[in-house]
Amino acid sequence: MDSNTVSSFQVDCFLWHVRKRFADQELGDAPFLDRLRRDQKSLKGRGSTLGLDIETATRAGKQIVERILEEESDEALKMTIASVPASRYLTDMTLDEMSRDWFMLMPKQKVTGSLCIRMDQAIMDKNIILKANFSVIFERLETLILLRAFTEEGAVVGEISPLPSLPGHTNEDVKNAIGVLIGGLKWNDNTVRVSETLQRFAWRSSHENGRPSFPPKQKRKMARTIESEV
């Protein structure tokens, strides 16, 4: 196993522990708590994949961080912060919408890259909107936290989420996953609309009204992908 992979996991575990202590003091805002929950799942998945104990890794990560801080000067810290581009966290969904329970009458699931796509193909003739919470850097989607498809009544009928055991995805990965989700939902004569925020940063190939246009051939291809590969 690569030593950098292990040490990276150890540092991530310790930094998550610090953030958890911060949250326990009720100091974290909604995006902070959201990322904390998602990162916890990711760390559990990585720990299982690497065969490493999280508590032991956290202690080792603490030693690594302490050693770095001992060598770090205030001036170097200022220069590092100034050189790192700042990302923005954008939220289409409230915490209630993100945590809302849902079930599927006709479940379909597909994994593409490090993203998991789930949808209920029993949904027909509904107006559906896609909403997402994600971070943006350089005016492009950086990290998808969660994307969900809602009916006008507020029911969740689809979802795209990162796989905890496979961290890391690109803007193109997210765009492809959105295309698969839209294709599956539109096959049952649902009307699918993308939120303005999501359309701006992650789905630029749509019309101004947020309704992506797919030719019939592409619709059939997407539907076959959902049916045959899920």
From Swiss-Prot:
Post-translational modification as stated in the protein's UniProt record: Upon interferon induction, ISGylated via host HERC5; this results in the impairment of NS1 interaction with RNA targets due to its inability to form homodimers and to interact with host EIF2AK2/PKR.
Region described as Disordered: 206-230
Keywords: Eukaryotic host gene expression shutoff by virus, Host cytoplasm, Host gene expression shutoff by virus, Host mRNA suppression by virus, Host nucleus, Host-virus interaction, Inhibition of host innate immune response by virus, Inhibition of host interferon signaling pathway by virus, Inhibition of host PKR by virus, Inhibition of host pre-mRNA processing by virus, Inhibition of host RIG-I by virus, Inhibition of host RLR pathway by virus, Interferon antiviral system evasion, RNA-binding, Ubl conjugation, Viral immunoevasion
Region CPSF4-binding, annotated ranges: 180-215
A biological-process GO annotation: symbiont-mediated suppression of host mRNA processing
UniProt-annotated location(s): Host nucleus; Host cytoplasm
Chain location of the short sequence motif Nuclear localization signal per the record: 34-38
GO molecular function, one term: RNA binding
GO CC aspect terms: host cell cytoplasm; host cell nucleus
Domain notes: The dsRNA-binding region is required for suppression of RNA silencing.
Family per similarity comment: Belongs to the influenza A viruses NS1 family.
Name of the protein in question: Non-structural protein 1
